[in-house]
Amino acid sequence: MILLKAENLVKRYGGRTVVDHVSFEVGAREVIGLLGRNGAGKTTTFRMTIGMVRPDGGTVLFNGADITRLPMYKRSRRGMGYLSQEPSVFLRLTVEQNLLAILEYTRRSRSERLTEANKLLAQFGLERNRRQKAYSLSGGERRKLEIARALVTNPSLILLDEPFSGVDPIAVEDLQREIRQLREQMGKAILITDHNVQRTLEVCDRALIISDGKVLAQGPPKELINNELVRKTYLGHTFRGDEFD
């Protein structure tokens, strides 16, 4: 089942085409990477997908419905979650209060909201941080809280913008584990864009490589790593991909 389908997305700034007829799909329970060098067009493609940037051409379909012109909040109501690269937690609230603040917008009783908050705290290993103010969390703990908050509305697709940015290696491994669990245990589909190519490919079923505004290649990680054009254009010939063999 295809959840998200981007067809021939185009974006121009002035006389320059930064995204040139990019197409891709995200199926149910798939983790897809959107990768490319700085200035390649991947971030603009990602932002058109989530609704932050309006395309000059092409369409975005979600569950078969055309959402190309819908703002972000309406996409969220349809089941599309989003984790921003910038910190999005309420810094002066505790971890528990951050979850309850988002749960206030759901049609649940107080006891149901507390139960859901407790479940998310346990799922993301944040129970011991329950009373901790968000500003004092580590980068990895903050990322976990942000993902937990994104799950409050029970999205079927989650878009992660630089989830591994500013996070130490051990915390990155924790986040990778959470991403795998979102897919395997909760049935979520995930679209990731990140500059940490190695870590992103480790959790992806497939990835797209964007270059000069176009899809250079797409496929499973091992296939991309062994693609000579991808190595020449993006990964470099010294990129290690032994774990994908």
Each model region followed by its residue ranges:
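The feature captures the beta-strand-to-loop junction immediately N-terminal to the Walker
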Residues: 35-37
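Helix-to-loop junction immediately C-terminal to a conserved catalytic motif
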Residues: 50
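Conserved ABC transporter NBD signature motif
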Residues: 58-65, 78, 116
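Conserved ABC ATPase "signature" region
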Residues: 100, 111-129, 177-180
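Conserved ABC ATPase signature
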Residues: 133-137, 141
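Conserved catalytic motifs of ABC-family nucleotide-binding domains
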Residues: 154
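Catalytic Walker B motif of ABC-type/P-loop ATPase nucleotide-binding domains
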Residues: 158-162
